[in-house]
Curated annotation (Swiss-Prot):
GO cellular component: cytoplasm
UniProt similarity note: Belongs to the alpha-IPM synthase/homocitrate synthase family. LeuA type 1 subfamily.
Entry EC number(s): 2.3.3.13
Quaternary state and interactors: Homodimer.
Subcellular localization(s) per the UniProt record: Cytoplasm
Record organism: Thermosynechococcus vestitus (strain NIES-2133 / IAM M-273 / BP-1)
Name of the protein this chain belongs to: 2-isopropylmalate synthase
Residues covered by region (Regulatory domain): 414-535
Gene3D superfamilies the record matches: 1.10.238.260, 3.30.160.270, Aldolase class I
Length: 535
């Protein structure tokens, strides 16, 4: 259902996903353009109203990502595609250019309004900030009809000055005014009062949607947002799995399911009868779990087991009393059905006799759109897996597809061969062959404290890019001794963190490929920093 303006016609809560912009600011969560496009497509299937695709002026990579998402996802039936821009002409021009292919483009511009930011960061007076905000919103409006304005650090801004800024930018053409709790400082009561104050003291607020953006430094982001909805906010800026810098952002899945499960409580705040069963958001909740796994795999950020809604233990019961109750009637200890978020028992869908068309069809049904090259590689992986595993599940297919969509960087380093030798009375030794970006094949060997350490040492002898391994984790995709193992690693180089992910029934091979994927991201990062030192 398309957003309608003026905003008083907005009779539901709009979901503004900023996974690709604010979420990517998590250390090590950097994504390449193809990965961003994959996530954007899934966000569209999920039903988000607005996708903040990036910060076009920040780097050529961000510009390209926003432009490609605008072209492929920003269709007439797709979501609004948004680009972030500081309150400067060059930022706004870059955003407008990147967003041009989108059917529904939005420019999101911002400037700080708290006295501490004005004094120490901007070194400007309130009058100067007021003029800049009004002028830049009007400038953005000259490119697109849909303009969002954020007064950065609104939670610590003087309310009277905040009201004045918001009134001016709405007069200048802002269709959405976003209230950020930039440092995650406010409590629900304070945040609700802030939104209520804006609703009551900004004379033209009925001409704009009130949006909220918050960080989770005190673990209050979701609670703050729900209080904001009760006081008039109609757009929530959030990320999948709550990823983001520091403690992260408000988690989309928690907000959406809170509004779904407790809709009878929230209905009156949106002018609906309490008994209304109509959803409060446009989200297809059955796509939540799939989207969560996709973002986790591509960013390399694991989901804590006890994470609400999408954690591995979210629907698990250890207590015997709880287990007995759930077996008799799920609602004794579960407030929602796991199937609501797309978490269902996976059926055996394919076997070793299945053909390429059946494989491709099932991947499309699972939401994956692979290129011909990716599909060919994925099918070979599937046939190889089918020879090793008796049962193939959807989780197995997802692991293969995500591995291929993350992709091997054909212009970077490629792992051609890996072999290890180890045992309880042998020193772990690894031999690897790596193809360099110039096409040269190099082979080397190393001894380590274990087989994975030996592989990494051997790869390092070939690649010779200084780095420090700061995280290594293995997760089983399915049950059974023949399960695919997913390996996620994070490397640090100077002040940057890079992640890599791979899946294989052989954990050593998965570990080696995950390491190569991370090294290629590091390699590309070094190239970009050399070409664009300020990016």
């Amino acid at each position: 259902m398309r957003i309608k303006y003026p905003p008083q016609t907005v009779d539901r809560v709009l979901i503004f996903d900023t996974t690709l912009r604010d979420g990517e600011q998590s250390p090590g969560a950097s994504l390449n353009v193809d990965e961003k496009l994959t996530i954007a497509r899934q966000l569209a299937r999920l039903g988000v109203d607005i996708i903040e695709a990036g910060f076009p002026f920040a780097s050529p990579g961000d510009f390209e990502a926003v432009q490609r998402i605008a072209e492929t996802v920003g269709t007439e039936t797709g979501p609004v595609i948004c680009g972030l821009a500081r309150a400067t002409r060059q930022d706004i021009e870059a955003a407008a250019k990147a967003l041009k292919p989108a059917y529904y483009p939005r420019i999101h511009t911002f400037i700080a309004t708290s006295d501490i930011h004005l004094e120490y960061k901007l070194r400007k007076t309130r009058a100067e900030v007021l003029e800049i905000a009004q002028e830049m919103v009007a400038y953005a409006k000259s490119f697109v009809d849909d303009v969002e304005f954020s007064p950065e650090d609104a939670g610590r801004s003087d309310p009277e000055f905040l009201y004045e800024v918001l009134e001016r930018v709405i007069d200048a053409g802002a269709t959405t005014v976003n209230i950020p709790d930039t440092v995650g400082y406010t409590t629900p009561a304070e945040f609700g009062a802030l939104i209520k104050g804006i609703k009551e003291n900004v004379p033209n607020i009925d001409r704009a949607v009130i949006s909220v953006h918050g960080h989770n430094d005190l673990g209050l982001a979701v609670a703050n947002f729900l209080e904001a909805v009760k006081n008039g906010a109609r757009q929530l800026e959030c990320t999948i799995n709550g990823i983001g810098e520091r403690a992260g952002n408000a988690a989309l899945e928690e907000l959406v399911m809170a509004l779904y499960v407790r809709r009878q409580y929230f209905n009156p705040f949106l002018g609906r009868p309490p008994e209304s069963e109509a959803p409060l958001t446009n989200i297809n909740t059955r796509e939540i779990y799939k989207t969560s796994r996709l973002v986790s795999n591509l960013t390399g950020m694991l989901i804590q087991p006890n994470k609400a809604i999408v954690g591995a233990n979210a629907f698990a019961h250890q207590s015997g009393i709880h287990q007995d109750g759930v077996l008799k009637h799920k609602q004794t200890y579960e407030i929602m059905d796991a199937q609501l978020i797309g978490l269902a028992d996976n059926q055996i869908v394919l076997g070793k006799l299945s053909g390429r068309n059946a494989f491709a069809t099932r991947l499309r049904e699972l939401g994956f759109e692979l290129s011909e090259t990716e599909l060919n590689k994925a099918f070979l992986r599937f046939k190889d897996l089918a020879d090793k595993k008796k049962e193939i599940t959807d989780w197995d297919l997802e692991a293969i597809a995500k591995d291929e969509t993350q992709g091997i960087d054909l212009q970077g380093y490629q792992l051609e061969f890996v072999q290890v030798s180890c045992g309880d009375h042998a020193r772990p030794t690894a031999t690897v062959t790596v193809r360099t970006p110039s096409g040269e094949e190099l082979t080397d060997a190393a001894i380590g404290t274990g087989p994975v350490d030996a592989v990494y040492r051997a790869i390092n002898r070939v690649v010779q890019i200084p780095n420090r391994l700061i995280e290594y984790s293995v997760q089983s995709v399915t049950a059974g001794i023949d399960a695919i193992g997913e390996v996620t690693i994070r490397l640090q180089h100077q002040d940057r963190i890079y992640s890599g992910h791979a899946a294989n029934t052989d954990i050593i091979v998965a570990s080696a490929q995950a390491y190569m994927n991370a090294l290629n991201r590091l390699y590309r990062g070094l190239e970009q920093r050399a070409l664009h030192p300020q990016a």
